[in-house]
């Protein structure tokens, strides 16, 4: 198995109060996080400062859930890369299915957001995933690859930019539904994404780029998923708001290091 550094991200989405963020982030920071695993949590934009202040661990990173594709300017309601970096952030989630499906973000917009963040030196957790209808129509790889190809069009073969990308496969039909892709289903897609990368970007880089799984990942299913050779970690939704997230950190560490 290639020595890819395990990655686990917690996406808090639009959840939590100031008091909750303070206590929950403090609890995660107090947990023993090994230096062999990347642990990142993404509170809502209004809670970023609170999370940063509550984080006492050098091993825990705070991320943003979204970023705009332009710099500072007249973009009401948006947040620029420069603003995130001014807060000391180094990670950002881009292209989550809720941004794509609910907010109308296109593949091209997601790719441009990612490119700008990467060019400014951030690490991007780039999300891809298919709906249930698309899976039933046997379009799973077509849809996921189309989303990656949009990013590929922006980044080309730039190893400097791609090395700061973490691909998150999140089947839309599994997010928040409690229906989890089987390890076999998830591994099949991860293999396909890695194959695309090898063929279209860099064969050597394909063995190093991290591809993580999201979609109702929790403490009960992450061990079996993490045993799949092409699943390098998780992007966790609901479970990241619970003490269970610390359990997942421990399980991933045990499984992949």
Swiss-Prot record:
The keyword Isomerase applies. SUPFAM superfamilies: Triosephosphate isomerase (TIM). One of its GO terms (cellular component) is cytosol. Pathway: Carbohydrate biosynthesis; gluconeogenesis; Carbohydrate degradation; glycolysis; D-glyceraldehyde 3-phosphate from glycerone phosphate: step 1/1. Transmembrane segments: none annotated. Substrate binds at residues 11, 13. GO terms for molecular function: methylglyoxal synthase activity; triose-phosphate isomerase activity. Keywords: Cytoplasm, Gluconeogenesis, Glycolysis, Isomerase, Lyase. Its main location: cytoplasm. Belongs to the triosephosphate isomerase family. This is Triosephosphate isomerase. It comes from Giardia intestinalis.
